[in-house]
A protein has these predicted regions:
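N-terminal accessory alpha/beta regions
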Residues: 65-163
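Acidic/polar hotspots within intrinsically disordered regions
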Residues: 7-8, 16, 38
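Active-site substrate-binding loop specific to GH73 endo-beta-N-acetylglucosaminidase modules
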Residues: 26-29, 36-37, 110-117, 149-379
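Flexible, low-complexity segments enriched for small/polar residues
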Residues: 42-48, 52-65, 289, 293-335, ...
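Extracellular beta-strand-rich recognition modules
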Residues: 2-6
């Protein structure tokens, strides 16, 4: 049976969902999450198992049956702590991959860099770390299209892995010193004698505070604070990067440099504080603002809890759950601007566990693609599957390392249109049609073994698939249609 992964519910796939079912020979079984255009009808309190499945969908890319079994018997809070344990680094066979895929030796090209990240997301043992990389990539949107090589964006993602759940101040300093961001927003052209406002504007408007919480003078003086934050010899290094190949040069890139002689040493007033500020001072002042905490909290809610209105509407429309935002803001200030503390507060909160949020957001293309691949089982090398996966993400509107603009992706209902919906169905069908994959074998075995007395019916088949894929709940109309289709075409 095929149930197509969409978002945090299951959208009725009609004949697409059951087209290849045979009750006596189950052909496919694919996870989906969506309730687009369909109202969930469940009213009972969530069970422990349902809450844990919900947590895995949000804090990761969903859970395989084996992952669910690995936390059986643990309290919900213990599962949260387990998912938030980032002490062990992921280990990947990068040497083997780069030998088979020459373009992954230096990751210059978009396709290779995107495939590299897909592999890490699928194979990671710490999915929340990769999920946070997606989160920051969505906010601090930086595209390789302007940057000669996509490896510089890969390096930025690595910085998110190191700082993405730490102190916001440290993350923003790392972002401000990141060569990809410097060149993306032209801070190499931001001089003490002639400022360029691009980065000063975006760190306030898009990255940290949001529209309406600063003035034009704040933008100018923030830009002045970041004068001298540049890269070493940008023109020369750009030429070398364009001439760079896998052999004989290896990987050449920009390196951050602070040029004290190019820094504006005059007094600056940023958000009401005056002094001879530099970039680190500007970050400290920004991170001390309540508006910053509220902005980051709302992004976290939008990404992990429930779809909000698009970000450009935030100045005109309040948050979906003001109490939730306040809880995360309090956690931010009570724990030294810690993003990890905000995440822990969110995942352990009543608002996160509430049934009204369990099926209240649409998966991004990357979440859907990676979740499906993790369900199907580990990637066996060598494989071109990750190249296909990154191209599917792009076809559905989320080219990894290639956001459409500095505003990133808005998400929510914008992920779903006719073309993207078909892409999701086709991708899930292709990946889960391979019965040689370990995860697919496991799913089929579990579904077959769940029949108990051996009686095979359409009702049993639908319920067995929903149970083994989560468990996940669907709208009554979805369940009824799936059962009708299974009854008609399942034998």
């Amino acid at each position: 049976m095929v149930i197509i992964v969409i978002d945090d519910g299951v959208d009725w796939g009609g004949r697409y969902a059951l087209r290849n079912i045979r009750i006596n020979k189950i052909k496919k079984c694919a996870l989906s999450e969506s309730s687009v255009g369909d109202v969930m009808t469940t009213t009972q309190a969530a069970t422990q198992e349902e809450l844990v499945a919900h947590l895995f969908r949000r804090a990761g890319f969903g859970a395989t049956p084996s992952e669910m079994e690995s936390v059986k018997g643990m309290d919900y809070e213990e599962v949260v702590d387990k998912l938030m344990d980032f002490s062990s680094p992921d280990v990947f066979p990068t040497d083997f991959i780069s030998r088979f895929h020459k373009d992954q030796s230096d990751l210059r090209l978009a396709e290779a860099a995107g495939a590299h990240w897909v592999y890490r997301m699928v194979m990671t043992d710490t999915p929340l770390r990769e999920k946070m990389c997606l989160f920051w990539h969505r906010i601090f949107a930086t595209a390789g299209t302007k940057l000669i090589q996509h490896r510089v964006i890969v390096n930025q993602i690595n910085m998110f892995r190191e700082r993405g759940v730490g102190k916001l101040d440290d993350l923003l300093v790392g972002l401000s010193q990141d060569p990809a961001m410097i060149m993306w927003l032209d801070n190499q052209d931001n001089h003490g004698s002639n400022i360029n406002e691009n980065y000063g504007r975006e760190i306030l408007e898009l990255f940290a505070m949001g529209v309406g919480n600063y003035t034009e003078d704040d933008i100018k003086d923030t830009a002045r604070a970041f004068t001298g934050w540049t890269v070493v010899n940008p023109e020369y290094m750009s030429i070398k990067m364009r001439n760079n190949t896998v052999r004989p040069y290896g990987y050449i890139s920009w390196q951050y440099e602070y040029d004290a002689e190019d820094h504006d040493q005059g007094p600056k007033t940023i958000l009401g504080e005056t002094g001879n500020w530099d970039g680190e001072d500007a970050v400290r002042i920004i991170c001390d603002q309540k508006a910053t905490a509220e902005y980051i909290a709302r992004h976290l809610y939008h990404f992990f809890v429930a779809d909000e209105v698009p970000v450009p509407q935030w100045p005109h429309q309040g948050p979906r759950d003001e109490t939730a935002i306040k809880l995360m803001v309090d956690s931010y200030f009570n724990n030294g601007h810690s993003i990890k503390s905000m995440l822990e507060t969110m995942f352990k909160s009543d608002f996160f566990k509430d049934e009204s949020t369990r099926y209240a957001r649409i998966k991004s293309p990357a979440e859907m693609v990676v979740g499906t691949m993790r369900l199907a089982g580990p990637i066996k090398l060598p494989s071109d599957e990750t190249y296909y996966a990154q191209s599917v993400c792009a076809n559905m509107g989320q080219g990894l390392l290639r956001p459409p603009s500095v505003e990133g992706w808005q998400g929510g209902s914008e992920w779903i249109n006719t073309g993207a919906y078909v892409e999701r169905i086709n991708f899930a069908s292709r990946i889960l049609n391979d019965s040689d994959k370990e995860g697919v074998k496991d799913l089929l075995t579990r579904i077959k073994n769940s029949s108990g007395d051996g009686t095979l019916t359409s009702d049993w088949l639908v319920e067995a698939c929903l149970a083994v894929l989560g468990p996940i709940e669907v709208a009554k109309t979805t369940r009824d249609r799936l059962k009708i289709y299974a009854s008609k075409y399942g034998n």
